[in-house]
């Protein structure tokens, strides 16, 4: 499996939406990753694992329901959102930092193309790696189904800019730094992993009329917040 921290300004890796095949970029990326892993297997070293956590505040729930029950794409300050920033770090036998894995619950959708970008996670990674060179910093996408970046106090989302990417990236990197400061050693014998598949009860299915209304609201609210041309540009460059 290859886990990618997605953005709306990077090449498409797998079949999605209107693009129905794996991109040439994916094939080359897969080969490079396999080569990288093979080389790293010969450079394994003992490390200690540490865990810390802090918070970051630029994410917001993106579904606002009005008094009539209509839902639209808009900042919902009181909506459900997770602002925590969990941080796992690795240190070598000299207690020197060698790796950082951090997570945050927010869609990396500040930029929409046509420029290729790692969005705020990429900027946060670069910031951390420059400060702690030669550390490798990795981003793990959090549970951000209806959460996106928010830059102001208005009742609509405005298009993001490169300055917003830098600002949010630095803010997240600073939160990771706080998590590193407050981290504690985790004995390897207590580390566990498990997988569960909870069965959730289903409500009565919506009618086609109700689904059509929801779809119309979604399209209308999306048009209010994002540039159609930006989406088309990002889609076209991703196909290449």
How should these model regions be labeled?
Residues 1-240:
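Non-catalytic substrate/cofactor recognition surfaces at enzyme active-site rims
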